Amino acid sequence: MSCVPWKGDKAKAESSDLPQAAPPQIYHEKQRRELCALHALNNVFQDSNAFTRETLQEIFQRLSPNTMVTPHKKSMLGNGNYDVNVIMAALQTKGYEAVWWDKRRDVGVIALTNVMGFIMNLPSSLCWGPLKLPLKRQHWICVREVGGAYYNLDSKLKMPEWIGGESELRKFLKYHLRGKNCELLLVVPEEVEAHQSWRADV
């Protein structure tokens, strides 16, 4: 199964009185070039100044082959399409860690109150101007809670996509994790990772 746009409870949500438009306090960084990793990080921190392209490029150049978690997925120098190694190192500069989620586990055991946000890597359609090409490429997106609700802050979206509460979020995550080539990172404070308190079953 390939990853396709989330539809889940969208129809139900659209017919309800729950808000669909993004409240003004949500920071949603839009896609520029191949900088989806940068956008996902800034959207997680809800801060346009959390990271810059230059910051991520410095981190990438600092990482040696011996420290690469997945050396076969290295970013091409300077193109901005950074891999998980750069994301993990960038988070560590802010006192956070990325927990790579084992897709065999039930997302129901995630202690959501201890997770700041989620970064997902999933296939996304390529576009040439207004044209959508019949090709897919891996893409980083951010999902996080703002104002008591969870939102998909994919930088390719025109505006944040409302997901809903905790149960809707878990459905969203399950749906995408069933797909091929979809991965999930939990963004948590260092102390949460150290004590594994992102798990509700410990």
Curated annotation (Swiss-Prot):
Transmembrane segments: none
Subunit note: Interacts with beta-actin/ACTB.
Catalysis: reaction(s): Thiol-dependent hydrolysis of ester, thioester, amide, peptide and isopeptide bonds formed by the C-terminal Gly of ubiquitin (a 76-residue protein attached to proteins as an intracellular targeting signal)
Modified residues annotated as Phosphoserine in this record: S15
An example Gene Ontology CC term for this record: plasma membrane
UniProt key word Signal: no
Function per UniProt: Deubiquitinates monoubiquitinated probes (in vitro). When ubiquitinated, cleaves 'Lys-63'-linked and 'Lys-48'-linked poly-ubiquitin chains (in vitro), hence may act as a deubiquitinating enzyme. May increase macropinocytosis and suppress clathrin- and caveolae-mediated endocytosis. May enhance membrane dynamics and cell motility independently of its catalytic activity.
Domain annotation Josephin: ranges: 23-202
Keywords: Cell membrane, Cytoplasm, Hydrolase, Membrane, Phosphoprotein, Protease, Ubl conjugation, Ubl conjugation pathway
Post-translational modification: Monoubiquitinated. Ubiquitination activates deubiquitination activity in vitro.
EC number in record: 3.4.19.12
Root EC class: hydrolase
Source species: Mus musculus
Gene Ontology biological process terms, A to Z: cell motility; endocytosis; membrane biogenesis; membrane organization; protein deubiquitination; proteolysis
Entries under PANTHER family matching the protein: JOSEPHIN 1, 2, JOSEPHIN-1
Active site: C36, H139
Spans annotated as Disordered: 1-22
Gene3D superfamilies per the UniProt record, alphabetical: 3.90.70.40
One protein family per Pfam: Josephin
Recorded GO MF terms: cysteine-type deubiquitinase activity; deubiquitinase activity
Location of this chain's protein in the cell: Cell membrane; Cytoplasm
Identification of the protein by name: Josephin-1
Tissue-specificity statement: Widely expressed (at protein level).
